């Protein structure tokens, strides 16, 4: 991307709507409730012939630095410092407010390029707000409607004028780089099943961080990044959008998704929280590995267990992070107790990697990242058909399938049909009669003998064709 644009303004003027319009996707949550956006969210934007990075920010309201509003203000100021040009969005329909004037003064003092955007200009009565905006001293407002896509050509021209054509159209950017970048195929899609089985360490690893509210998810990511990139604090439920950040760990690109804390469904009543949870679920489905953050001081709440079960059912690789380990007394005894509870309460994820750590102090972060990499490798594991059939023969010899209606079931052949997660197909007689207990026996054997702890393992059955079956029925 050639340059960076920050979108700022007071709450509820349409910043996230404009952000979604420019990135061409509904990435940012949009609601009539003021103050939906809290963290700064980057995205790849396209506006006519411009390609740039755009940053959505929280609605600016001045407050003390120790308050939530004050910390949101600091995040927005960081976005302005990072950007080459700022889009200052006002609500032309509502007109100027003292908050707009305060923000305008702050932007003037910074001396960086600013484009004044009069949003909602399609509404009746917006003319007065448009002309009032001249008093901000930031030049002629650019009238747009982010919701309806009006005024985008004028906005493009205003951005080019603000930063200059040299920055808007750098000579070293070729045509290939200005194409729209489509997202990679999501895990589990038909296209991905044809991928080479070799584990590719050059590809970015997508990791979602989930957990109950106030488990320390954003603090953990900030510690990884080494900066206060995400908004944190003692208040539960600060994060609303799923925010993605990229960084390198020992030469491997990691793309992490911070998500909103997820409570029990019965407690989620507000529309905005439902939108946040839906956004978190999308991040889980798009991730490869999911880190479930537990609060070590109150681990294994019912919601914690349900989140692990959700990740396993979605077929994602899972790692447990026992956060706030700095608050634990007698860590050795407590860790032994946690491991016992993990095996007992999470039988569907037997052997799952669990790491004690502290986002506050940085304790255990390297072990957590290594566990994420190791789990992802296991999730991508492929086993040769020859090894699988030798293993199947040994398993059925040691513990033969049960007899159903007086006839013993026969498992004849086994192959791996896909990875991510590992899935196997067994050719057998009467697949519908295989009991669930025998499938669990096979899954546990695969997990143990092929060293696949903690990842979902799928076993499917199909009937083996008998070419003489129809003739046998006729003789009867």
Curated annotation (Swiss-Prot):
Where on this chain does GTP 1 bind?
A: 9-16, 56-60, 119-122
Record-linked InterPro entries: G_ENGA (IPR031166), GTP-bd (IPR006073), GTPase_Der (IPR016484), KH_dom-like (IPR032859), KH_dom-like_a/b (IPR015946), P-loop_NTPase (IPR027417), Small_GTP-bd (IPR005225)
Share an example GO biological-process annotation for this protein: ribosome biogenesis
Binding of GTP 2 occurs at 211-218, 258-262, 323-326
| Positions of the KH-like domain | 381-465
Taxonomically, the superkingdom here is Bacteria
**Function as written in the Swiss-Prot or TrEMBL entry:** GTPase that plays an essential role in the late steps of ribosome biogenesis.
HAMAP family membership: GTPase_Der (MF_00195)
| NCBIfam families from the UniProt entry | GTPase_EngA (TIGR03594), small_GTP (TIGR00231)
Q: What is this protein called?
A: GTPase Der
Gene source species: Agrobacterium fabrum (strain C58 / ATCC 33970) (Agrobacterium tumefaciens (strain C58))
């Amino acid at each position: 991307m050639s340059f960076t644009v920050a979108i700022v303004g007071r709450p509820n003027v349409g910043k996230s709507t404009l952000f979604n319009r420019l990135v061409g996707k509904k990435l940012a949550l949009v609601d009539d409730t003021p103050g939906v956006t809290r963290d700064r969210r980057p995205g790849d934007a396209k506006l006519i012939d411009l390609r740039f990075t755009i940053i959505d920010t929280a609605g600016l309201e001045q407050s003390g630095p120790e308050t939530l509003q004050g910390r949101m203000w600091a995040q927005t100021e960081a976005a302005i410092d990072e950007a080459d040009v700022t889009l200052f969005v006002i609500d032309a329909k509502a007109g100027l407010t003292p908050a707009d004037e305060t923000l305008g003064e702050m932007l003037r003092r910074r001396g960086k390029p600013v484009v004044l955007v009069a949003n909602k200009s399609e509404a009746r009565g917006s003319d007065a707000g448009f002309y009032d905006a001249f008093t901000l001293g930031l030049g002629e407002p650019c009238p747009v409607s982010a919701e309806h896509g009006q005024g985008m050509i004028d906005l493009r021209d205003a951005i080019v004028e603000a930063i200059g054509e040299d920055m808007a159209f750098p000579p070293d950017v070729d045509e290939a780089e200005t194409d729209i970048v489509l997202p990679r195929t999501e895990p589990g899609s038909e296209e991905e099943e044809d991928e080479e089985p070799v584990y590719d360490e050059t590809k970015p690893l997508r990791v979602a961080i989930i957990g109950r509210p106030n488990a320390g998810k954003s603090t953990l990511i900030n510690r990884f990044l080494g900066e206060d990139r995400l908004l944190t604090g003692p208040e539960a439920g600060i994060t609303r959008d799923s925010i993605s950040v990229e960084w390198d760990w020992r030469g491997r690109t990691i793309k992490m998704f911070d998500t909103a804390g997820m409570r029990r469904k019965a407690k989620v009543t507000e529309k905005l929280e439902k939108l946040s949870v839906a956004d978190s679920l999308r991040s889980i489905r798009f991730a490869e590995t999911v880190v479930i953050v537990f609060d070590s001081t109150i681990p294994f709440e019912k919601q914690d267990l349900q989140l692990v079960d959700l990740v396993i059912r979605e077929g994602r690789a899972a790692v447990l992070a026992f956060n706030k380990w700095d608050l634990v007394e007698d860590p050795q005894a407590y860790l032994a107790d946690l491991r016992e509870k993990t095996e007992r309460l999470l039988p569907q994820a037997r052997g799952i990697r669990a790491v004690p750590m502290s986002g506050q102090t940085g304790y255990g972060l390297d072990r957590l990242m290594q566990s994420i990499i190791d789990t992802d490798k296991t999730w991508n594991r492929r086993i040769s058909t020859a090894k699988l059939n030798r293993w199947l023969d040994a398993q059925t010899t040691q513990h033969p399938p049960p007899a159903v209606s007086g006839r013993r079931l026969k498992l004849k052949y086994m192959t791996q049909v896909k990875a991510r997660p590992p899935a196997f197909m067994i050719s057998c007689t009467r697949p519908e009669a295989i009991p669930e207990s025998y499938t669990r026996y096979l899954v546990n054997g695969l997990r143990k003998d092929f060293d696949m702890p903690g990842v979902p393992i799928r076993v499917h059955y199909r009937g083996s064709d008998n070419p003489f079956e129809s003739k046998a029925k006729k003789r009867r």
